[in-house]
Amino acid sequence: MTASTKVRVAVTQHEPVWLDLHATVDKTCRLIAEAAGNGAQLITFPECWLPGYPAWIWCRPVDMGLFTTYLKNSLSYDSEHMRRICNAAAQHKITVVLGLSERDGNSLYIGQCTIDSTGKIVMRRRKMKPTHMERTVFGESSGRSLLNVVDLPIGKVGALACWEHIQPLLKYHTMIQGEEIHVSAWPVLHPHMGGESLWGMSQEGGTGASQVYALESASFVLLTTAVLGPTCVKKMNLSPPWDTLGGGASAVIAPDGRRLTEPLPANEEGFVYADLDLDMILTCRHFVDACGHYSRPDLLWLGVDTREKTQHRPEGQADNAAYGLDVPSGLVEEEGA
């Protein structure tokens, strides 16, 4: 844990410039500067903030024109756009947890990364399993994405996206890395409308999952959402219920599950600020430490394979490595070798 027990955070509740990478990067840098100017040491962004969540996928199964536009406006790590964001973090000496549609070649992934206050990318991951219609746009991750918690001067910061918060094994692996501040990234979250719509995709469901995560992990949870306005409805030709305006539900949740912040209006852009007292984590984990004294590893334990599985492997490695099995000594190069 950081030597200082007080951390000021800025949780965004803003609207991206939909399907416009350059303009959304401009806005990202402005928000970084504003948050730092208000004393924040950490700023968080929602799922697929860059270039906005592809909400049309829930309205129709295929839209090749929009997909092509979306691909061309998704963010590559090795790009001037990413360098601008990293430079903004360094200039303003603030940690950034970013949500992005990650472009790797001609494939897309729901990505998250942490940029430290020197501008270095210290964590990058992909959503383990895109949810339902998301699979028409995004690919899956591999083992490296399980390493989603990083130790920073402000504390141990981790991140998951959307319905990863109902994946018990993934959650436990995140918690067991010693997480203290957790970024819970979502797109927009509207109040449940009744009928056949899934409660778990609603504001109540997303907020509830984030509060349960706080309880289970005894960590601070920064629930981060976007705002959906009429420009998005028009650009993506959205139909009910996805044409509903608003969707902002950003919040800061304490390690015991309570909300620490008042909500902004759902259709209003702004920051949710909070000053975290990390000593509260110690108090909560004294009662419940699910990765320590409140566990039974003699009876229940989690197996994990954090190796990255690539599309091309040297002869002799392919069969075993593809399934996460051990390979003969000397056949696997150490990462970075």
From Swiss-Prot:
All copies of domain CN hydrolase, residue ranges: 7-278
SUPFAM superfamilies xref list: Carbon-nitrogen hydrolase (SSF56317)
pH dependence, record text: Optimum pH is 7.0-9.5.
PROSITE patterns: CN_HYDROLASE (PS50263), NITRIL_CHT_1 (PS00920), NITRIL_CHT_2 (PS00921)
Position of the signal peptide: none
Enzyme class: hydrolase
InterPro entries in alphabetical order: C-N_Hydrolase (IPR003010), C-N_Hydrolase_sf (IPR036526), Nitrilase/CN_hydratase_CS (IPR000132), Nitrilases_CHs (IPR044149)
Molecular function as annotated in GO: arylacetonitrilase activity; hydro-lyase activity
Active site annotation, chain numbering: E47, K127, C162
Stretch list, region Disordered: 311-337
Recorded catalytic activity of this chain's protein: a nitrile + 2 H2O = a carboxylate + NH4(+); 4-chlorophenylacetonitrile + 2 H2O = 4-chlorophenylacetate + NH4(+)
Record's function text: Nitrilase that hydrolyzes preferentially phenylacetonitrile, but also (R,S)-mandelonitrile, and 2-phenylpropionitrile.
PANTHER family on file: ARYLACETONITRILASE, NITRILASE
Name of the protein described by the UniProt record: Arylacetonitrilase
Organism in which the protein naturally occurs: Aspergillus niger (strain ATCC MYA-4892 / CBS 513.88 / FGSC A1513)
